[in-house]
């Protein structure tokens, strides 16, 4: 019967909803929720264990304790359901209602809601325009507030202390009204007339001049408008009625031994009820004011504690000295409702066990212990047993399974056939942390895992555990098989490279197979086929590494898919010929005819996937693995102590270094070098000695001398096991071998500084006690760092996911013509990332032309795949404008064309792909590999930074970027502009190298001149900053008076005198206003002009400039008038690794940021103040001047009279992303963040596609600030979603009104997550109280657009397979709103549609 009822219950339609609104509850609303008033603080009767009447667990209010049974037991059973017992007043119904029925408490005196009082900015304070301090004094009964001044001189809202109040009473009697406590605040709030206030403020806003006042008024206005539009009333921020949570959500559980465990909420409610009842009694008794006041204050405090304990004053503690957990604590934090129960739940049909290796499995299989499978698939087995007639009832089936009858195992085999299971390893850092496999039943208790998927899971077999989940429904199984099967996840979503590459043993085996040995057994034999090679190897006629000639047959696949066979004879080895047997048809033999290291194998798999597709690759990967394991076993590669060969030269090299160190030590003692220099030099000496030793060691290890067939000695790569492991990329590296057989080298202290005495021993020789002790430092620091790093990296990932979670591909093409310009990344003389890698898989935004013509090479909207990239390289294209998510025009999502290729699938991205989450995971997952340290520049690094020339590495021709220059008397070019760059272009017009050159650089070659590799083409003095003349003439000193603005200094060694300008601070009062400068005059004494302008050629001299010329000296173009000594830049710490990435994504301002020019114009310096210079920029068109005060110690890059462009650097330093966005635009800030983040990852050798970083940047840029409102609803200075403004503007333009203008704003990821439109998503991220308070006051509604909100309300997410469900729902909703239009369709059209559908279905294979 009960089941029948449940069934009937399910038939009733659940409520469909499209959004969730949050608001303030009015007292009447709270009463309407309630099923009765709770009047007593009692919980249950401790003798009978029955709930007390009118108490906190009262059955009359909240419902029966047992299903369909009233409290006194008069009515039992189902037939009475719905009856209310006349004896005990309990409704006969399910006990489940105790989870949903609320009660209420009528408060004897109103109480302020602490969230609206204390959550900053205080809403009550803003509303009343009073300070929080004052309101608190009123609420907690320390002072009076005037409510109704009447005809008196008092003002409404004025604070009165006790004495003032008594004085006023004497003076005015009862003409005025003043109160204290929440009643007073309630009255004040009730008296506010929202519409009138809003009107007033809107009128006075334009006339306000002071910035702070304007901000305050805008804030208040926004709050008032929020209240007004949402229909909330301000007085509802004060509670008159308190709702009571349903009792089953705050349970009271009997423990054994007669004690009870209770939720803290019960204690808190009990306090409130006790105080409320006492207050009622006091009011009835008309007790003295002071007692009532005290009781009211206590009531206020107890309600505060219930809502948010510890927000004000000391937290109320329970019996165990711990603060009680209030309602606010229930929902916030990691253990709160959101993160613990809504976003992550524990699920059934899951198990976990240790993993072991399964080298015999296929890629799509995993070994599942029989015991586990039996438990996981129980319901399926019961069903099958019953269906087969082996068991009559479920109970019998249960018994059979418990006894483990033989038939059960047969049934189990059938049940799991083709039923995929999902394996997950924590921490799941990216989507490859959960994959589906077909289970294979095994004996034992450990799960077997295929070795190739270990890289994706980051799993090893040292005791890792993994969880198994069973997809139950058909849809779930389908998804697991079609999307999550390990065979479908061959490429990494982070960079599009294969993620199932062999590693360790497999690599070693394949490498060993493909090596060649001089004069091996069978060298020089000829074979007619690979089969014959196999025979020769099996019979021992030829060994694995013998160099032989073999005739091979290759399959060549043409462009049209035609397969042709070709035969040729190749020089190869026996092993490589054997490898070619597993090579799939269609791949060239050359791919295995080389030493197969890890990189080569990865490339081989990649090529296979791109050329032959998924299926062949999967089979091939498995074959590679089996082969690799087999030959690794045969090779017998193992490590013995004799494999670590210590080079003989080591001891002489170490002795030389020690002698050098002694010499430096002596120089230091005789005072020739400073302590710092000595330290740096010593470290350099040891570092280079270490390099030399390791070089000798590697040469020693990597080659051996053998006698070839002609009896001559010849060198060949060695078969030393350690060397083979490192060379193949299986395990270990040169740096680790150096510690085994070279010297351990320099060690760092825990604080990061380097200890100057290195460890000269290696592990083979063994360490002495001191050396061992020094080594422990590093090892321990490593462990501590790792722990910190994991936490930090996890937090970064969480913030990234949160900011990007709602970004989904929702349309094919937004049609924008914008894009980012991609060029190869060149740093100095190296191409760090070629153009090919940057544009592969992106869509062209603007036609790419053949160089030097107007013909289109790649039209707009082409998806650049491998073939297209080859074409671009062929025609040496070196910049392409590609579509990017940053410039995508789609509202609330992105389009497929702007995103380009789905990296994990290799084709254009599908609709509904959750690119935001994928991007966040791709950036966050390698986070644990990044370092945590900040790099100190010292020693070798600091000297390298003072370069003074450019030496080219490639020949080509010279090209200058944004450079102004003059030609000096020697015919050489002198650069007279700031951020100039010099590039080397090869004969095809591709940029090969790029260097920054400072002001005053002398170029040895003219522009466009040919240069040879190794030429030095530019020189400058790194220690001084010259001032260079652009005209020739004689010089005139102005305002240069000896002893006032300058002094003469004579160099002791040379006897030359030079003039040094005094700093303003050092001059006497006479020289303060003087501006020393050099004017250039012609032969007739007239002022010369700078060529092409009307500006007289005069050069101001800043403080401490050195002039080596005399008055009236002749000077030529390009000569230095003066030199300004550069203080060697202070050693800046470079933040590296994880902290740097976090800083970039949080868009934090650096400590001393670069100062950029706000407008274009001419520089001049105004009046100086004590510590600052006044920089003035005058625009050329005579607009408004821009002034900025800059601290004196900042090194300026500009001189008086110089022209700057907007966004140019005025003072050096790390650039702030906000400034770049403001002054140089979106494209520049995107490039800056992408390149900076990539630099950090590149240093660790991690590849991440630029797209992912762009996705995050798009989310950081999703807000804008309204600069002028036009005819829109927005307020000036308001922060709004860009897509909102765009939509509003489209409507306004359609109606012919003035659209709003806005400036994009860059928010850090935490700020951006909290500023999202969905309050549910923001609340579940951080600062829950603040977010919810703000949302409630604004009456916000959440349209459940993102992924997180939908997970929280328990729906399918609007991404992936859930995307279609949401799309149909939204279309249905739109249809409901639209007038019905009947769609007519002809038969031929229907036929065509069907054909298209079938074609589509066929193309998905």
Curated annotation (Swiss-Prot):
GO molecular function annotation: DNA binding; DNA-directed RNA polymerase activity; magnesium ion binding; zinc ion binding
Pfam families: RNA_pol_Rpb1_1 (PF04997), RNA_pol_Rpb1_2 (PF00623), RNA_pol_Rpb1_3 (PF04983), RNA_pol_Rpb1_4 (PF05000), RNA_pol_Rpb1_5 (PF04998)
InterPro entries reported in the protein's UniProt record: DNA-dir_RpoC_beta_prime, DNA-dir_RpoC_beta_prime_bact, RNA_pol_asu, RNA_pol_N, RNA_pol_Rpb1_1, RNA_pol_Rpb1_3, RNA_pol_Rpb1_3_sf, RNA_pol_Rpb1_4
EC number: 2.7.7.6
Chain positions recorded as Zn(2+) 2 binding sites: 814, 888, 895, 898
Keywords, ordered alphabetically: DNA-directed RNA polymerase, Magnesium, Metal-binding, Nucleotidyltransferase, Transcription, Transferase, Zinc
Record text on cofactor binding: Binds 1 Mg(2+) ion per subunit.
Binding site for Mg(2+): 460, 462, 464
Enzyme class: transferase
Domain of life: Bacteria
Function comment: DNA-dependent RNA polymerase catalyzes the transcription of DNA into RNA using the four ribonucleoside triphosphates as substrates.
HAMAP family documented for this protein: RNApol_bact_RpoC (MF_01322)
The protein's name in its UniProt record: DNA-directed RNA polymerase subunit beta'
Organism: Shewanella sp. (strain ANA-3)
């Amino acid at each position: 019967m009960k089941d029948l009822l449940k069934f009937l219950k399910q038939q009733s339609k659940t409520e469909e909803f499209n959004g969730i609104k949050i608001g303030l509850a009015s007292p009447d609303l709270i009463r309407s929720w309630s099923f009765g008033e709770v009047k007593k603080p009692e919980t249950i009767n401790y003798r009978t264990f029955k709930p007390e009447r009118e108490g906190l667990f009262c059955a009359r209010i909240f419902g029966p304790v047992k299903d369909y049974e009233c409290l006194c037991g008069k009515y039992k059973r189902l037939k009475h359901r719905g009856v209310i017992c006349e004896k005990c007043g309990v409704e006969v119904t399910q006990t489940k209602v105790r989870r949903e029925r609320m009660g209420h408490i009528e408060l004897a005196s109103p109480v302020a809601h602490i969230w609206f009082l204390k959550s900053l900015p205080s809403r009550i304070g803003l509303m009343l325009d009073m300070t929080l301090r004052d309101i608190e004094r009123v609420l907690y009964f320390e002072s009076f507030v005037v409510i109704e001044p009447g005809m008196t001189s008092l003002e409404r809202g004025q604070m009165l202390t006790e004495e003032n109040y008594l004085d006023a009473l004497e003076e005015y009697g009862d003409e005025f009204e003043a109160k204290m406590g929440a009643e007073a605040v309630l009255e004040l709030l009730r008296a506010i007339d929202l519409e009138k206030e809003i009107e007033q403020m809107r009128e006075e806003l334009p006339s306000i001049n002071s910035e702070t006042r304007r901000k305050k008024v805008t804030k208040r206005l926004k709050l008032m408008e929020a209240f007004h539009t949402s229909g909330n009333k301000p007085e509802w921020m004060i509670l008159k009625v308190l709702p009571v949570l349903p009792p089953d959500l705050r349970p009271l559980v009997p423990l054994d031994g007669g004690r009870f465990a209770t939720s803290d909420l019960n204690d808190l409610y009990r306090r409130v009820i006790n105080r409320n009842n006492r207050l009622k009694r006091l009011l009835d008794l008309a007790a003295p004011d002071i007692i009532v006041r005290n009781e009211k204050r206590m009531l206020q405090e107890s309600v505060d504690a219930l809502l948010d304990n510890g927000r004000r004053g000391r937290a109320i503690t329970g019996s165990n000295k711990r603060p009680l957990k209030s309602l606010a604590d229930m929902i916030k934090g990691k253990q709160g409702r959101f993160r613990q129960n809504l976003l992550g739940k524990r699920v059934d049909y899951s198990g976990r066990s240790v993993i072991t290796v399964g080298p015999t499995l296929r890629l799509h299989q995993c070994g599942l212990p029989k015991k586990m499978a039996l438990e996981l698939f129980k319901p399926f087995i019961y069903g099958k047993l019953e269906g087969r007639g082996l068991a009559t009832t479920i109970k019998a089936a249960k018994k059979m399974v418990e006894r483990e009858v033989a038939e059960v195992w047969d049934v189990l085999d059938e049940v799991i056939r083709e039923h995929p299971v999902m394996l997950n390893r924590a921490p799941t850092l990216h989507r490859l942390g959960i994959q589906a496999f077909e289970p294979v039943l095994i004996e034992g208790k450990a799960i077997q895992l295929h070795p190739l998927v270990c890289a994706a899971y980051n799993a090893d077999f040292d005791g890792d555990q993994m969880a198994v989940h069973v997809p139950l429904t058909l849809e779930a199984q389908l998804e697991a098989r079609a999307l999550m099967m390990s065979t479908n996840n061959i490429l990494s979503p982070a960079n599009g490279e294969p993620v199932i590459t062999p590693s360790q043993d497999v690599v070693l085996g394949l490498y060993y197979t493909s090596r060649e040995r001089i004069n091996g057994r069978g060298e020089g034999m000829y074979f007619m086929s690979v089969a014959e090679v196999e025979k020769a190897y099996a019979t021992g006629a030829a060994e694995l590494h013998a160099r032989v000639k073999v005739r091979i047959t290759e399959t060549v696949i043409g462009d049209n898919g035609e397969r042709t066979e070709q035969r040729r004879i190749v020089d190869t080895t026996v092993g490589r010929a054997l490898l070619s047997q597993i090579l799939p048809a269609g791949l060239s033999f050359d791919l295995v005819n080389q030493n197969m290291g890890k990189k080569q194998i990865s490339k081989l798999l990649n090529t296979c996937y791109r050329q032959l597709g998924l299926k062949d690759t999967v089979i091939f990967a498995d074959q590679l693995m089996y082969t690799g394991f087999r030959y690794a076993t045969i090779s017998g590669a193992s490590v013995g102590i004799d494999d670590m060969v210590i080079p003989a030269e080591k001891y002489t090299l170490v002795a030389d270094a020690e002698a050098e160190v002694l010499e430096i030590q002596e120089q230091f003692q005789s005072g020739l070098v400073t302590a710092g220099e000595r330290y740096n030099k010593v470290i350099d000496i040891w570092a280079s000695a270490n390099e030399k030793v390791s070089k000798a060691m590697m040469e020693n290890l990597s080659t051996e001398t053998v006698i070839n067939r002609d009896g001559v000695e010849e060198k060949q790569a060695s078969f030393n096991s350690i060397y083979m492991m490192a060379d193949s990329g299986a395990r270990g590296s040169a740096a680790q071998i150096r510690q085994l057989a070279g010297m351990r080298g320099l060690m760092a202290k825990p604080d990061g500084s380097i200890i100057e005495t290195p460890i000269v021993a290696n592990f083979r020789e063994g360490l002495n006690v001191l050396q061992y002790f020094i080594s422990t430092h590093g090892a321990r620091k490593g462990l501590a760092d790792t722990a910190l790093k994991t936490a930090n990296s996890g937090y970064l990932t969480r913030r990234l996911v949160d900011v990007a979670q709602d970004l989904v591909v929702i349309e094919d093409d937004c049609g924008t013509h914008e894009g980012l310009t991609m060029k190869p990344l060149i740093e100095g003389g190296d191409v760090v990332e070629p153009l090919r890698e940057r544009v592969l898989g992106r869509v062209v935004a603007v036609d790419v032309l053949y160089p030097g013509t107007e013909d289109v090479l790649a039209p707009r909207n082409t998806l650049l795949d491998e073939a297209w990239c080859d074409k671009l390289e062929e025609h040496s294209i070196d910049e392409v404008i590609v579509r990017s998510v940053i410039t995508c025009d789609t509202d609330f999502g992105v389009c497929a064309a702007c995103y380009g290729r789905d990296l994990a699938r290799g084709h254009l991205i599908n609709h509904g792909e959750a690119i935001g989450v994928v991007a966040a995971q791709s950036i966050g997952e390698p986070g644990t590999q990044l370092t945590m340290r900040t790099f100190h520049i010292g020693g070798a690094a600091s000297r390298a930074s003072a370069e003074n020339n450019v030496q080219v590495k490639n020949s080509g021709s010279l090209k200058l970027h944004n450079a102004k220059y003059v030609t000096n008397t020697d015919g050489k070019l002198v650069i007279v502009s700031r951020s100039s760059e010099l590039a080397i272009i090869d004969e095809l017009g591709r940029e090969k190298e790029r260097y920054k050159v400072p002001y005053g650089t002398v170029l040895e070659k003219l522009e466009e001149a040919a240069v040879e590799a190794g030429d030095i083409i530019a020189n400058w003095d790194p220690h001084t900053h010259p001032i260079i003349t652009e005209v020739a003439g004689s010089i005139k000193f102005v305002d240069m008076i000896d002893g006032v603005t300058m002094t003469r200094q004579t160099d002791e060694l040379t006897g030359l005198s030079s003039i040094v300008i005094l700093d303003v601070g050092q001059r006497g009062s006479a020289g303060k206003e003087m501006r020393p400068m050099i004017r250039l005059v012609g032969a007739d004494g007239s002022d010369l002009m700078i060529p092409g302008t009307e500006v007289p050629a005069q050069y101001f001299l800043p403080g401490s400039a050195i002039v080596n010329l005399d008055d009236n000296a002749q000077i030529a173009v390009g000569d230095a008038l003066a030199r300004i000594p550069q203080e060697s830049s202070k050693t800046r710490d470079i933040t590296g690794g994880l902290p740097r990435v976090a800083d970039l994504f949080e868009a934090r301002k650096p400590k001393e940021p670069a100062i950029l020019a706000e407008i274009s114009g001419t520089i001049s310096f105004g009046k100086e103040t004590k510590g600052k210079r006044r920089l003035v920029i005058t625009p050329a068109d005579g607009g408004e001047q821009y002034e900025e005060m800059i601290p004196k110690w900042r090194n300026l890059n500009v001189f008086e009279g110089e022209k700057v462009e907007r966004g140019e650097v005025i003072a050096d330093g790390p650039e702030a992303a906000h400034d770049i966005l403001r002054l140089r635009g979106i494209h520049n800030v995107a490039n800056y963040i992408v390149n900076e983040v990539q630099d950090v990852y590149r240093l660790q050798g991690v590849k991440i596609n630029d797209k992912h970083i762009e996705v995050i940047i798009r989310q950081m840029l999703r807000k804008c600030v309204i600069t002028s409102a036009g005819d829109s609803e927005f307020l000036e200075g308001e922060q709004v979603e860009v897509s909102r403004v765009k939509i509003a503007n489209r409507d306004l333009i359609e109606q012919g009104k003035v659209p709003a203008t806005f400036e994009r704003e860059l928010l850090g990821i935490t700020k951006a997550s909290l500023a999202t439109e969905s309050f549910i998503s923001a609340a579940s991220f951080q600062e829950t109280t603040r977010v919810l308070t703000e949302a409630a006051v604004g009456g916000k509604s959440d349209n459940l657009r993102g992924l997180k909100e939908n997970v929280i309300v328990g729906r399918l997410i609007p991404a992936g397979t859930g995307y279609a469900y949401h799309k149909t729902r939204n279309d249905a909703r739109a249809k409901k709103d639209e007038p019905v239009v009947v769609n007519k369709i002809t038969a031929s059209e229907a036929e065509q549609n069907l054909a298209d559908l079938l074609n589509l279905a066929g193309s998905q294979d």
